Amino acid sequence: MSMQAYELRDDDRRPPINDVLEVVQRGLRLQPKRLPSWLFYDERGSQLFEDICDQPEYYLTRAEIDLLNVHAGDIADVLGEDVRLIEYGSGSAIKTRMLLEQLHSPVSYMPVEISPEPLRQSVQRFSELFPQLAIQPLCADFTRPLRLPIPPRAPRRNVIYFPGSTIGNFEARDAIDLLRKMRNEMGEGGGILIGVDLKKDPAVIEAAYNDKAGVTAEFTLNMLVRLNREIGSDFDLSAFRHRAHYNPMAGRIETHIVSSRYQQVKVGRMHVDFGDGEAMQVEYSCKYSLSDFATLAAHAGLKVQHVWLDPQQLFSVQFLVRA
């Protein structure tokens, strides 16, 4: 079945250019300066993230795939029959396929993705792999309230699928808010299937965000490329560098864009000064113990019903239900 059989529905929840400019200017007024990580994900950024997942240092994707190789059938049994799978993100070619192959008579698959082109590619990929599966793509920002399309038949349960470790990119307060939003959207009897990266040797964690090929560095600086293109700023990429280090007290990777000299950047009508060595925070990647994440989920009115681990116990997939 061709992808033309599916309507790429646009929820109009993507930020307009003026909103991007306002967000950037507000973040650059802060001390220290700070920009939101969703700015990474234009089409180039989405592709670079896929490339990051292929780097030898980036254990997260391999660990999650190893986990699914062992446990996908058990996960499908826990989710049960007639599930509507709502994925926050456009769909990993491998991980989502592994899960969909095991699901028992799923009602539909709904990828929610802010970037139109990765979403179209996802629809085409999965419509070819699963020609009998109803696919209902939604182009939207999954951090904001969603208008879910009507499924082709009534599901027994809505399951929000949030693979990878994206929940770790949210600070605790924002992660709780997002989990509460998921709790509302899944409805009574629904669940959340979520990837959670675990605390481990800090050297292993740091290497994953500082690959030798420099793909993560390119991904980080692509944010500035996007801003120059979309809002007409004049960031000089040669004058900034990527930095990511693990903060063991906070249990997270902290990613910054660092100015390599004193400089002034034009952002709209605003002129922003950067000092030599000044760091602008662009992303956190939080790591959890199992008890840490159970506590976080409880604050959102959820409880952990099942936990699956990869063979090396680097990564977890957890199933949450209403407490």
Q: Each PLM stretch: what is its role?
A:
Residues 176-188:
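A short glycine-rich, Lys/Arg-flanked "PGG" loop and its adjoining helix->strand segment in the class I
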Residues 185-199:
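Conserved beta-strand signature within the Rossmann-like core of class I S-adenosyl-L-methionine
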Residues 204-286, 290, 294-300:
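Substrate-binding/catalytic lobe of Class I Rossmann-like enzymes that use SAM or dcSAM, i.e.
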Residues 32-79:
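Class I SAM-dependent methyltransferase Rossmann-like catalytic core
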Residues 92-105:
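Conserved SAM-binding loop of SAM-dependent methyltransferases across substrates and taxa
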Residues 115-116:
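Conserved SAM/SAH-binding beta-strand->alpha-helix loop
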Residues 82-91:
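Conserved class I S-adenosyl-L-methionine
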Residues 1-39, 46:
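N-terminal auxiliary segments of SAM/dcSAM-dependent transferases
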